[in-house]
Amino acid sequence: MSAIHPTAIVEDGAILGENVSVGPFAYIGAKVSIDDGTSVASHAVIEGRTSIGKNNRIFSHSAIGTIPQDLKYAGEDVELIIGDNNNIREFTLLNPGTKGGGSVTKIGNGNLLMGYVHLGHDVILGDNCILANGATLAGHVELGNNVVIGGLTPVHQFVHVGDFAMIGGASALAQDIPPYCLAEGNRATLRGLNLTGLRRHIPREEINALKSAYRELFEEGKALQDVAQRLFEESSSEKVKNLCKFIKTSKRGIPFTRKS
């Protein structure tokens, strides 16, 4: 049974699962679906065609599913899909997709979106990511799994960030960051591998293979695409293959400077 505060507004047509709680002065629109065990705190606004999974915690003053911040938006039927077990902290802004970007924004499972985080239209966010306070993903940005974005870091439209990458706080990211890498600065550039994150999740032999590949790709003065193609074909490491595939398919380029 759901627990809805008497001052909350839940429009006719909204679907709430078992043990959903809705706090004081929250608003749930008519096209919203919220699955079992999710809590919505006071003054949160959830509207539009928004689907929210199980056991999410949505904190006060979040704005979820409000129309995209895109001047081309003309009232099309667009969607926001949120998975399970996410923590969406205070004053977070999550927009649905647009017709020009597939009409859907997708958020995976187990993510922590800290205060004042913004996910723009058509963003694709994987699982188990951490976006620190004030991080901003512009339209069409794609993040893999286990990505960390530091506080107050904006990410440019259409940028892709691979699995287990980390972006330092107060950076400005305008190009693609390959999986397993660390980047920081304004504009952000590669600073090495995200060894802290890798050691928590990836065997040592895979990390050693990534270290060797990183040196050859970014530090030895060789043509990046040529090295990526060769390592993709020759390496027995799946992680190295993933790294090289990302580089080969990057559309915005990889920001790095070679050591002198």
Swiss-Prot record:
EC numbers on record: 2.3.1.129
Family, per entry: Belongs to the transferase hexapeptide repeat family. LpxA subfamily.
Compartments where found: Cytoplasm
Gene coding for it: lpxA
Subunit composition and interactions: Homotrimer.
Gene Ontology, cellular component aspect: cytoplasm; membrane
Name by which UniProt lists this protein: Acyl-[acyl-carrier-protein]--UDP-N-acetylglucosamine O-acyltransferase
Pfam families named in the record: Acetyltransf_11, Hexapep
Annotated metabolic or biological route of this protein: Glycolipid biosynthesis; lipid IV(A) biosynthesis; lipid IV(A) from (3R)-3-hydroxytetradecanoyl-[acyl-carrier-protein] and UDP-N-acetyl-alpha-D-glucosamine: step 1/6
GO MF entry, a single one: acyl-[acyl-carrier-protein]-UDP-N-acetylglucosamine O-acyltransferase activity
Keyword DNA-binding appears in the UniProt entry: no
PANTHER family registered for this protein in UniProt: ACYL-[ACYL-CARRIER-PROTEIN]--UDP-N-ACETYLGLUCOSAMINE O-ACYLTRANSFERASE, ACYL-[ACYL-CARRIER-PROTEIN]--UDP-N-ACETYLGLUCOSAMINE O-ACYLTRANSFERASE, MITOCHONDRIAL-RELATED
